[in-house]
Amino acid sequence: MKQMTEQNEFILSKQIIRSGTSIGANVEEASAAQSKKDFISKMAIASKEARETHYWLRLLRDSRLCKKLEHAELIKESEEIIKILTAIVKTSQKQN
């Protein structure tokens, strides 16, 4: 049972790191976009990655593999990141 728990922790943490770091990478790429369309595309991908990260954080919470206080703040922050990125995409699309 312990080995299974450790394996689940590894899988969840790997997914959170992958999708979480992808947010920043896509925002960075967007800042060097060659066109408005490219900028919107990269920011939209960052928004999708933020939603995926939010999913993995909720899954981590529901699995009870970490303390409640640890994931509550991360989930709240991920919601804020989603709101920010969504607003950037929508505003950029209106201006395009």
Residue ranges and their predicted role:
Residues 1-29, 33-96:
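Short, C-terminally biased terminal segments at protein or domain edges
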